[in-house]
Swiss-Prot record:
The active site is at residue 179. GO terms for biological process: tRNA processing; tRNA threonylcarbamoyladenosine metabolic process. This protein is considered an atypical serine/threonine kinase, because it lacks the conventional structural elements necessary for the substrate recognition as well as a lysine residue that in all other serine/threonine kinases participates in the catalytic event. BUD32 has protein kinase activity in vitro, but in the context of the EKC/KEOPS complex, the catalytic subunit KAE1 switches the activity of BUD32 from kinase into ATPase. The gene is BUD32. It comes from Coccidioides immitis (strain RS) (Valley fever fungus). It catalyses: L-seryl-[protein] + ATP = O-phospho-L-seryl-[protein] + ADP + H(+); L-threonyl-[protein] + ATP = O-phospho-L-threonyl-[protein] + ADP + H(+). This is EKC/KEOPS complex subunit BUD32.
Amino acid sequence: MTEEFTPPPLPPPFTSNKTPPVLLAQGAEARLYKTDFLNPSFPAALKFRPSKPYRHPILDRRLTRQRVLQEARCLVKLLKEGIPVPGVLSVDWNTGQGEDETGNGGAWLLMEWIEGPAVRQVVNHWEKWMKHCESATKGNNSGMNENFERSAEEDIRSLLRRIGRVIGALHKAGVIHGDLTTSNLILRGQSNENTTNIDPHSTTLKPNLEGEIVLIDFGLASQSVQDEDRAVDLYVLERAFGSSHPRTEIFFDEVLKAYRESFKGASSVLETLKKVRMRGRKRSMVG
């Protein structure tokens, strides 16, 4: 008989909310909630970093404070530069004055809730839809209509170019994301009927690839203008496409082309990316 799941404790002041925050994700360092603490019609994202009982209390407070403030500072800086990221609503880096986890110690960051599907979900849907369309025309002498195929591929290319531009703006502002994956890119401002509310196994509906690219989850972010750091950011995203989106990977150059056009220092970053790739390949060969 399995034990009933007990939700982890929340930090104050969220413990007094009539409608408790909904736990969306739990990682090694933080928990992500959706909450209407401020206003029922104004949802927000709550990122809570609980204290670690296995760490020395002074070290724990220092590390937790450093990480939550680093994330908040990066977000505020990017917002000032006009880069689409969640707005910072509130931050507390000394919750419970460093008590252990049962006392809800740690730190939290309250952010704007970004409505929309993750790019990972949308691209997966596009790949399944393309496969379905190809199967539907299999056996036809003309195969898939060339104009249709070009149009569908241009849609995904356009999405990748938008991703490249927003990453270029991110790096131009001197911020490194640290965890660039398609799960940390959100498409905001589009109708979700063909994305978030569909059967994930459905392949008959054409996916909606429109919307503004919003960067989320800056838990590993840092401020840097080094080509190496920027190149590693791009390499992480490139590997994410290779592992999660094999059909779309062949269009990844669209990301890099748009990135190159986004700021003057992009060319040297892309040269460094070639070296990072070589190191990555050697590491894979060695194991």
